[in-house]
């Protein structure tokens, strides 16, 4: 074998070894990642439940707040329409009967 062929074979061997090391590192990190995920799932079930409970409470409060905002907007709309209706009746010379106590 010539020196050039030996250097080419040696270079390809070095590339193959580098690729093998990269694959081994990836495999080890993947295994470690899976292990960490499983460990985290086993370690924190109560934290997950607390977060879910907190999310449920926040959603309930958000729904209640949205309901209150919508009710206030509807009340304002009814008041505005009532005022407009009163103005139209006043222009025609009519009025609502308002009982005073």
From Swiss-Prot:
Task performed by this protein: Microtubule inner protein (MIP) part of the dynein-decorated doublet microtubules (DMTs) in cilia axoneme, which is required for motile cilia beating.
Signal peptide: none
Classification via Pfam families: CFAP141
Tissues expressing the protein: Expressed in airway epithelial cells.
GO biological process, one term: flagellated sperm motility
UniProt subunit comment: Microtubule inner protein component of sperm flagellar doublet microtubules.
Superkingdom of this protein's organism: Eukaryota
Protein name (database record): Cilia- and flagella-associated protein 141
Biological source species: Homo sapiens
Subcellular location: Cytoplasm, Cytoskeleton, Cilium axoneme; Cytoplasm, Cytoskeleton, Flagellum axoneme
Main location: cytoplasm
Annotated Gene Ontology cellular component terms: axonemal A tubule inner sheath; axonemal microtubule; sperm flagellum
Presence of keyword Cytoplasm: yes
Keywords from the UniProt entry: Cell projection, Cilium, Cytoplasm, Cytoskeleton, Flagellum
């Amino acid at each position: 074998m010539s020196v050039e062929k030996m250097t080419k074979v040696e270079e390809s061997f070095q590339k193959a070894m580098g690729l093998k090391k990269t694959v081994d590192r990836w495999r080890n990190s993947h295994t470690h990642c899976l292990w960490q995920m499983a460990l985290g799932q086993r370690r924190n079930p109560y934290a997950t439940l607390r977060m879910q409970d907190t999310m449920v409470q926040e959603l309930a409060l958000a729904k209640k707040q949205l309901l209150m905002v919508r009710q206030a907007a509807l009340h304002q709309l009814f008041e505005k329409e009532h005022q407009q209706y009163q103005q139209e009746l006043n222009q025609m010379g009519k009025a609502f009967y308002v009982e005073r106590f």
